[in-house]
């Protein structure tokens, strides 16, 4: 009788454990499938806290010049530019700003990461130092055949500071996530006015 009771107890424990595991997986699956919260909407002049960066978008414009603030364009390319004030809120100089703004597809075509230029010196932006706000330009290269938007939509991507990384045990900025969306009108010069949608 003692052996049978031990087997019964083992089967019962296994059954309960399995049931709890299945229920937990179901609950986590349901919670994970929930839609993410709506992103905060920002416009030109909005002050945005984005983890290690503070960004204030100023204006968006289009250029067909061969060189836009130090960023060279190839034949058959145009530039979609977002000017913004950018402030490094960390304690170290960094150039981790290229993925701060993610432009939504233009005319259904995905857009690569921008090149970032320093407006006051018209050259590609090097390290950005802590506490020193700079006016910068995010320059996306687009094919000349791309239909230009009259309004620009871009996600603002922030990272979270971790004092100890799980993999290396060092501090850093990790886990990029969308913290908002910038919507602003695109200024089109006369030379490219015929291309706007």
Each language-model region and where it sits:
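Membrane engagement elements in two modes
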Residues: 1-66, 74-75, 172-197
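Short strand-coil-strand connectors
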Residues: 49-53, 106, 155-159
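Hydrophobic core residues within well-ordered beta-strands of beta-rich domains
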Residues: 53, 80-82, 134
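The feature marks short-to-medium sequence segments in extracytoplasmic or secretory-pathway proteins
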Residues: 61-63, 74, 87-136, 163-169, ...
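Short, surface-exposed secondary-structure boundary micro-motifs
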Residues: 85, 138-139, 143
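Short, surface-exposed ligand- or partner-binding patches at beta-edge/loop junctions that are enriched
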Residues: 142-169
């Amino acid at each position: 009788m003692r052996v049978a009771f031990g087997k019964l107890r083992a089967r019962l424990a296994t059954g309960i454990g399995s049931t709890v595991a299945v229920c937990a997986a179901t609950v986590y699956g349901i919670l994970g499938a929930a839609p993410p919260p709506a992103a905060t909407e920002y416009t030109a002049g909005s002050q945005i806290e984005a983890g290690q960066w503070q960004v204030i978008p100023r204006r968006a414009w289009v250029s067909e010049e061969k060189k836009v603030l130090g960023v060279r364009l190839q034949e058959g390319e145009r530039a979609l530019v977002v000017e913004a004030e950018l402030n490094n809120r960390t304690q170290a100089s960094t150039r981790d700003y290229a993925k701060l703004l993610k432009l939504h597809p233009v005319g259904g075509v995905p857009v690569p990461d921008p090149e970032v230029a320093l407006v006051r010196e018209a050259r590609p932006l090097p390290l950005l130092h802590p506490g020193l706000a700079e006016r910068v330009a995010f320059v996306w290269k687009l094919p000349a055949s791309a239909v230009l938007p009259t309004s620009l939509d871009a996600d603002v991507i922030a990272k979270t500071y971790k004092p100890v990384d799980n993999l290396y045990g060092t501090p850093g900025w990790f886990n990029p996530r969308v913290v908002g969306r910038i919507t602003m009108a695109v200024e089109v010069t006369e030379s490219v006015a015929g291309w706007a949608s």
